[in-house]
Amino acid sequence: VPFHSVETYLARLIKLGESVALCEQVGDVATAKGPVERKVVRVVTPGTLTDTELLSDKSEAILLAVHQAGKNRCGLAWLSVTQGVVHLAECAQDELADWIDRIAPSELLASAGMTPTFEQKLRGLKTAGRGSWSFALRPDFQFDAGLGQRKLLEQLQAASLAAWSADALSDAHAAAAALLTYAEHTQGRSLPHVQRVQVQRSDALIDLPASTRRNLELTQTLRGESASDSPTLFALLDTCMTGMGSRLLKSWLLSPPRDRQVAQQRLQAQAVLRGDSGSGAWSSLREQLKGASDVERITARTALRQVRPRELVALRHALARAGALSVQLQALNPEPGTLLGGMARWLTPPKHCAELLHMALLEEPSALVRDGGVIADGLDAELDELRGIQTNCDAFLLDLETREKERTGIANLRVQFNKVHGFYIEVTQGQLDKVPDDYRRRQTLKNAERFITPELKTFEDKALSAQE
């Protein structure tokens, strides 16, 4: 399909639950003999979406891997590629339906070697309307506990999983192996931003059976409606100013913790923000957040080298907002260890990051890197030189033509360019006896000869590289 309309086709196919391979030209046109080399650079699937155009602001694309273990047990590992957190859990097979309801995956991975009974159970859950996830079978050898543990340690850059209380979850490790292998395969690269692991245990969460979730209409009505204007608890509570906030609220509703201290911390933070009069700092903070960019998704796309220039500009503005938000929260003098205290610290922008983005990018860059017009002047001397050559090409050719006419005495000499033969100096047949020794023949025509000089060849190399 045409590259400029690929997003439209992707959206239609992903909505149907299909996976799409993106193939790009990787060979050099100038040196290629025959068709230019192409390769699959990325596979877009329902559970590994990172494109803003394909994702709802208030929903996550979650990839879940399920490992059928012995003794009627299951290992679970799931990930939102834009969040960068691997979640691990283990459960009994008869609890699997509740876990899938809680996780709400967009895509589910399972082993091609699972038993027919277990496969029937998984497919039955989907048929029964327990989610709209797509189903993908992976080779059995990918569900290897040892491989999963090694991959998790590589992501965390750690020697042990004990610090995350994840060292003894061999069934979940097997699921994590398939999960990370599949995620890396679809993105066409490693996942450097995946640097956290979170273990979820059923006894740490409030037990909400699937029937209870449906009747409470947490995120979906009994009729199956889940739009933002549907009469669900999430739609009622969601007054968040950003998509990041809405997604966090939804995860809190789907996985409410038993720990009373967590609820108390959230209530304390709410009380501080509203103040005694009910009109505290929260209103100014909400105003500051209005129109904020989706930093979570932009940073993930940056790590995956999929980010677009205008997203980096949005990130630049978001970092400025984050700094202002941090100052506002610190002005409330939150106690260390509290939720607000942690938020004030986390919102402090990385040193020099915003400064680099301001210095490196134009105020209004092109939509795509290949279109040029992204990097600001003054950042790179070589780029400035190439950009100057591209801008002043006509002036250089006119100047060279004037100088060569004076040097050779050929009054009708012309310096020109075409896409087939590049830059050249054209001399008519009647003036060939005046051609200097440093002219090298490039093309012979019926009534003229075309030449190139060392100076023009050097300019040609720079001009063509400037276009690239």
What are these regions (language model features)?
Residues 65, 412-416, 424:
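Short, surface-exposed charged micro-motifs
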Residues 395-415:
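Flexible, glycine/threonine-enriched loop-and-boundary segments that flank and lead into catalytic domains
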Residues 112, 417, 428-429:
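Active-site proximal loops enriched in glycine and acidic residues that flank catalytic Cys/His/Asp
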Residues 354, 360, 424-439:
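Cytosolic, long alpha-helical scaffolding segments
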Residues 263-270, 431, 435-449:
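Short, charged amphipathic alpha-helical segments flanked by flexible coils
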Residues 1-274, 278, 283, 287-303, ...:
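Charged catalytic and DNA/RNA-contacting regions of genome-maintenance
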Residues 445, 449-468:
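Extended, charged coiled-coil "arm/hinge" scaffolds of SMC/Rad50-like chromosome-maintenance ATPases
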